[in-house]
Amino acid sequence: MAPQDRLTSTLTRPASTTTAPLLQVSGLSVAYGGRQVVSGVDLALGAGGSLALIGESGSGKSTIARALLRLLPASGRATGHVELAGREVLGLPERRFRPLRGRTLGFVPQDPASALNPVRTIGVQALEAAELVDGLAKEDRREAVLETFAQVGLTDPQRVFAAHPHELSGGMLQRVLIGLAVLPRPSLLVADEPTSALDVTIQKRILDLLSTLRADLGISLLLITHDLAIAAERAESLIVLKDGRIQEAGTTAEVFANPTSAYARQLHADVPALNPDRYADLRAVGEGRAGDPARIEVQGVTKTFGSLTAVDDVSFAVPAGTTHALVGESGSGKTTAIRLLLGLEQPDSGRIVVAGEELHGRSHASLRSVRRHLQLVYQNPFTSLDPTWKVERLVREPLDRYRIGDPASRRELVRETLRSVGLGEELVSRKPSALSGGQRQRVAIARALVLRPDVIVLDEPTSALDVSVQADIVETLLRLQADLGLTYVFVSHDLSLVRQLAHTVSVMRTGRVVEHGTVASIFDSPQEEYTRTLLASLPVGAA
Amino acid sequence: MSGYGGFALRRAGQAVVVVLLTYVFTFWVISVLPGDPVTTTLRNPQNGFTEEEIARIVSYYGLDRPVLVQLWESLSRFVTGDLGVSLRSNRSVADMIGEVLPSTLVLAAASLTIAVVLSFAIAFGVHYLPRPFSTALRSVPSLFLSVPGFLVGLLLIQVFSFGLGLFRAIDTDGPVATFFAALTLGIWVSAQIAEVLIANLDHEAAQEYAGVARSRGLGRLRMLLKHLLKPSSLPVVTVLALMIGEVLGGAVITEAVFGRTGIGNLVERSVASQDLPVLQAVVTLAAVVFVVVNLLADLVYPLLDPRVTLQARPEVGANA
């Protein structure tokens, strides 16, 4: 069943659309300067239909969106054909394209926090969208805006209207932006990663809102995403992109049941949500250690900042050689919890014991000796490595700090550690800028590993990476754990990833552990409402 | 709004301290400078004072007392608004400054107005005009900056006074002459404002929100006026406050070129004759102007930009 046929049965708006598709793109290529980033892309989207463009960073998916919206930076050149509602628009002068903006073609951007003018009120900017509604009298515009705000689920439209962007949360801002985009009733909505900057529960609500609006208003949706599971759940057809070229296209069901391209198959295998048991073998090694004595014990730890209790009576224990996951949304206290665990903050009360040694109330020097056994891999490999240092020096630094071995043995240890994380000899003299994101994170892991620590704290170690790179890193981490018996504390907002690699889980919310247990018990029979909400927010993938 | 009141009070207090410190510092610099203008003048044989008369005059002015006592008296007079008496003309310094101040204020105000209008016009042109014009306009600020002010002034006099006869070069305070003097100063100041403004507009135009606003169908003019102008102009407030100092400094040259009697002219004469009370007063006046203008800029900023918060809020881990 083609998307446009399915549409006639489900939509309230009469379908005027069985003929030409609303959006027909053929041979679209985009180049920045001399660099070709999109090559010969064809796609079609019927009125009321939904199409997802999927790809990793550098796949050209956002560039395609910007080319369609004609928002490419000055250096970008688009060639080919883009027909919108039967009209060629790519070659149209801006003056003639402008009437289509907003009215025919709406845009929901990626990062809601930067998508509204920070020094103007939301209301003033919303009125700009209301102006595009034909036949709406000036004095009725405000009313229309407030109605739209209510429609997109903003509880206090008056307050939102008067607010400046920095006074609202990311989820509220994304609702505002969706409201502004749908207010003039466009026929096509281009949503560029509309939820990737948001927490998982909010992500689900925003996607639900887009689905509802699409059905109620008969708007076609072009969804740009890196998340195969979201695309599968929210779009009727998919296009998989890599390096600016289409790898695979078809209805969602087809692509999922029977991916024909190697890349689509690999992508499918790398998405955690679709492969919860991918690393079952490696994980089983740690599973067998579950009864071992605890390597980390956190008992009744509380930390307050002024009036805010960031961590509230948190306790958990991690058996040696296993992975404990701290899961929560922004503001849940997981970051403070690991800062306490690393001895970067002092708790107000409670105790933390790592490898049998009390972490707090220690002198600087003895804290240093504990830290040797306690290493951190930071979230963003693009900022956590000194850009002026070579890989060799980055990995060797901890050895120099703790005066381990002589220069020759340090050099050998650095190379050995790099090999163990899958990095070759040839990279030692490179600087981080000459490495890919995945290679950088491997360097960061090697750097944590080189001291042979017992415990590694992994703070969202793959959230800045593409899904296929993430799969490689996760595999490396689990193999290292199986071989060396490392204990991991894994901090993440990504529940599907947690399910793939952790043994035990603590679910955190506003500083408290709301629920903890083994992965199986948390995922299969959650006891708390909040855990159930989190789990329900996961995109389930296959349609 | 109590946060704003407290902030304003704190900043005003700091401003007062800065002015007082400037006064003390100037006094100190003058007192340690070699050469004592009073005695040099009095002992000049041409003036024919006897030692007795000199001693009487010195004690009349309190110059025989310790420096700290003199500073204290001078400072307490200053606080009550008494700027002392000129050593050359024996007239009240306040009167002398009062005479020339209006002329300089008119010049400064006019040149700042011209600078603001000119710089916004240039920045607008850069962002609104089609390509060859906008590219050409981009280099205008550098051109303005690299031509010395006195040369511009001489050219303007040559063309508009001697050439076209629009004003008489000796009729210095007429409106037309004032306009050209202000233009001389304003061109130079406008270049610095325009550079900041153009860079800010470029930056804002590349922001995500600008693209999103364009996707709502806003035209170039509305984008510029409604979206880009305000965030781009905010830093200009700071630049403008700094420019006040430049304008006061630049007035010395401009006044000389156009033969105006203003503060610049007064400074020139007082330096030549080592008229210390006048210099002390002018330096303090400059400090007051500078401090007040920067205070105003600080006070205006939070009202213009809703994101500027005045109190450190309790640290909250990114609570969405």
Protein language model features and the residues they cover:
Chain A
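Conserved ABC ATPase signature
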Residues: H164-L168, M172, K431-L435, Q439
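Helix-to-loop junction immediately C-terminal to a conserved catalytic motif
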Residues: L69, L342
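Conserved catalytic motifs of ABC-family nucleotide-binding domains
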Residues: R185, R452
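Conserved ABC ATPase "signature" region
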Residues: D140-R159, S409-E426, L535-A536
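ABC ATPase NBD coupling module
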Residues: V89-G106, V124, L132, E254-P259, ...
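ABC ATPase "signature
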Residues: A249-G250, H516-G517
